[in-house]
Regions:
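Short, conserved phosphate/pyrophosphate- and ester-handling motifs at nucleotide-, phospho-/glycolipid
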Residues: 168
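A contiguous, well-ordered beta/alpha segment that forms the leading edge of an enzyme domain
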Residues: 4-9, 14-164, 177-180, 184-185
């Protein structure tokens, strides 16, 4: 009986010791994304570094095609020009989140600021000498846009959206979810 107990004890100790000795093998994917650089590192078990990198680049491409104000062919650029009112899941999610932040901040956070961003020379536009803010503010206000049946309804067609303040964080969330699907711990 003592031999069985000793053998069982030895097996348990060896199993525990072997499991404690596991060394994490971290994978890293890095590159350029959304106008900046990224490095994603994790103890990933279900994807290779190359698969992780490709999937991150796909997320980047989808985010740019949807929400970029720097790409004239993006869905958001086409919406801002009044060429479409169709929305994709990225814009719907971010617009709903932005509306929530706008309500919580009593309108101090607002993604309809694109006319002001342009007038002040941000986002690659040349600044107006002295922007006429009163004329621009009539097109700014989070309550001026609504989602109805997957479409954007603007109170005025000159209202424009700019998700630059929220899109990078959203994209990082997508990458984090990807890493979890790849087995990141």
């Amino acid at each position: 009986m003592k031999k069985i107990a000793l053998l069982l004890y030895t097996v348990i100790v060896l199993v525990l010791a072997a499991s404690c000795d596991r060394r994490a093998e971290y994978l890293t994917a890095s590159g350029a994304m959304l106008g900046t650089t990224f490095q994603a590192t994790g103890d990933i078990t279900d994807c290779t570094a190359q698969e992780l990198y490709r999937a991150i680049m796909q997320i980047d491409a989808e985010a740019k095609a949807s929400m970029s104000i720097f790409d004239s062919t993006s869905l958001l650029s086409r919406i801002n020009r009044g060429e479409t009112d169709s929305l994709d899941e990225h814009i719907i999610y971010n617009l709903r989140l932005a509306e929530r932040f706008s309500r919580l901040s009593e309108g101090h956070y607002d993604v309809t600021v694109k006319p002001l961003v342009d007038a002040w020379g941000f986002a690659g536009h040349e600044a107006e000498r002295t922007p006429n803010l009163d004329s621009l503010l009539q097109f700014v206000g989070y309550r001026r846009v609504h989602i109805r049946d997957g479409r954007l309804v603007k109170d005025d067609p000159r209202v424009q959206l700019d998700f630059n303040s929220i899109a990078k964080g959203y994209t990082v969330d997508l990458v984090a979810a990807l890493m979890e699907r790849c087995g990141a711990k």
